[in-house]
Amino acid sequence: MANIIAVVNQKGGVGKTTTTVNITAALRALGKRVLLCDFDAQANATSGMGVDKNTTSPNVYDVLINGAEPQKAVVSTKYGDVLPSNKALAGASIEMIAIPDREHLLQKALEQLAPNYDYIFIDCPPSLEMLTVNALCAAGSLLVPVQCEYYALEGLSDLLATVRLVKRGLNPKLSIEGVLLTMFDSRTNLSLQVAEEVKRHFPGQVYATVIPRNVRLSEAPSHGMPVLDYDPYSRGAEAYRMLAQEISAQHE
């Protein structure tokens, strides 16, 4: 049965989608069975895996709202499988209001897919609305990317408050898988200070691997591929390979 991990931080620009795409590809390269569930209407994770976000049908929106079979929506790529998204997902939170047990729609879909995978990663939207609540209800744990910049921890208190509410009433088993430092630059005091502050806030929960600031990580999505394929010898690719080893070791 799959380890279902939501990659979540409502603050935009922290490397959430980059992390979801590249950890999927890195674990696939280790021989793991991996599914990326794109739960963001921008569908950048879908296109980052080489899937055309404008033509995929059925997709995760159809699964949630129109009752499409989850397995029929899955697209296989050489980097891992994808449950794709598209812009229709933007209105899903409003459409969910009338659906009974709406917080668990994604959970029910992923339960059908989980026996086929070792890992399922959910790329969450940059907000704390019903789609994110669905992801938190479906996940067993959370991977929280934190950018090594000023105000890095801003908004995390809101995320943690939402997590506490979900644990109390909807998903008591939810835990933090790990906190990932992204866009790290060892040459700056700021990155080092942020890293220390994050470790103080999340003792024992911060990954040893840090993701460096790396231009190849920024370029790869425009080519529709993970950085591991775009530039396998880049510092970004090496960091995600190390993170995959770290996550894999946690689950052995």
Per-segment meaning from a language model:
Residues M1-E252:
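P-loop NTP-binding core
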